[in-house]
Amino acid sequence: MGQKTHPYGFRVGVIKTWSSKWYEDGAAYQKWLHQDIRIKRAIKQYLYNANIAGVEIERAANRAKVIVFTARPGMVIGKGGKGIETLKSGNVGTASKGETLFPGVSSFTDNEVFIDVQEVRKAETNAQLVAENIATQLERRIAFRRAMKKAVSTAMKFGAKGIRVRCAGRLGGSEMSRVETYREGRVPLHTLRADIEFGLAEARTKVGIIGVKVWMFKGEVLQRKARRIQ
């Protein structure tokens, strides 16, 4: 019987590269792994409105480089680079009224932290950003069919080779949960050289949580060099 496989993990080492780049043994491996998970989760929560497509972490010696991929680099960098400094060192004790508190990436690791912000130029064809956009619309009580169809048509218009969108939950406030799927173009999940992006988001509505999944096909990668987030 076939099993579901994560499209990204299925292609790691073939056409995709790891989102954490470092090597350690024993207890240090566990320590760094948990640090990476906490750092990525904290950044996603703190910069929720900045359209974060992904976070990569590179470690060498006593340094940790955190690469943030975003469709809104200006919001992350901030005025005069203040946002970068807040990401690195936090704003606890210095935050202004109404500002979200963030402990800083440095509080999660003993390494010296460097922040690098990379712009995602086409948010319309980034699977994670598309999934979060649909989830946001569902939370605003926009009809799920309208949100899904618009995301599919926009992605194809901006150059995607294929897209599949799946929403599951109490769609439209119905009594029973169900699954709705929209698809356009090719989405070859079994082809290893196919550049498939996968995005997952949750819409927290009054009737419950609605899960949103997006698969985006961007074409076939013929060269051997692994690709990172785009």
UniProtKB/Swiss-Prot annotation:
GO terms for cellular component: cytosolic small ribosomal subunit. GO terms for biological process: translation. One of its GO terms (molecular function) is structural constituent of ribosome. It holds the Pfam family KH_2. The keyword Ribosomal protein applies. Keywords: Ribonucleoprotein, Ribosomal protein, RNA-binding, rRNA-binding. The keyword Cell membrane does not apply. SUPFAM superfamilies: Prokaryotic type KH domain (KH-domain type II) (SSF54814), Ribosomal protein S3 C-terminal domain (SSF54821). Residues 39-121 form the KH type-2 domain. Part of the 30S ribosomal subunit. Forms a tight complex with proteins S10 and S14. NCBIfam families: rpsC_bact (TIGR01009). Binds the lower part of the 30S subunit head. Binds mRNA in the 70S ribosome, positioning it for translation. Belongs to the universal ribosomal protein uS3 family. This is Small ribosomal subunit protein uS3. It comes from Sorangium cellulosum (strain So ce56) (Polyangium cellulosum (strain So ce56)).
